């Protein structure tokens, strides 16, 4: 048996290890600007493949129901989806937030004023 297959296997292993290490060393952040509160922040919410509790807390505050000053726990999968769209689009500016979380009371109030507000809005679940 020649040395070539062992060498090739070692290279493939090393490249796979480096790729996996690079992915786990990834830092994800979102640049948010809330149009109603005028709050602006760049927040790291994920490091090395794990959600950063302090970053999530900060995002929950900026995406709170601003009418009632009531935060919730936003779904981290939503943040990953927004991050991925932001990255793929090549955007570099702040993401303009119109609405994040809505309390049931706020959703009910908005629903009474507009037919375009869902009764069981994803905003009330921290998913929009």
Predicted regions and their residues:
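Bacterial N-terminal signal peptides that target proteins for export
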Residues: 1-9
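Hydrophobic helical h-region of N-terminal Sec-dependent signal peptides
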Residues: 9-18
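N-terminal signal peptide c-region/cleavage motif recognized by signal peptidases
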Residues: 20-22
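Cell-envelope/glycan interface and biosynthesis
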Residues: 27-128
């Amino acid at each position: 048996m020649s040395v070539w297959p062992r060498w090739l296997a070692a290279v493939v292993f090393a490249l796979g290890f480096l790729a996996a290490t690079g992915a786990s060393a990834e830092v994800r952040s979102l640049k948010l600007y809330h149009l109603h509160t005028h709050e602006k922040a760049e927040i790291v919410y994920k490091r090395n493949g794990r959600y950063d509790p302090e970053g999530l807390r900060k995002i929950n505050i900026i995406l709170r129901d601003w009418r009632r000053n009531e935060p919730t726990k936003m779904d981290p999968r939503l943040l990953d989806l927004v991050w991925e769209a932001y990255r793929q689009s090549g955007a570099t500016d702040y993401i303009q937030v119109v609405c994040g979380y809505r309390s049931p009371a706020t959703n009910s109030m908005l629903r009474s004023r507009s037919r375009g507000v869902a009764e069981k809005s994803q905003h009330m679940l921290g998913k929009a």
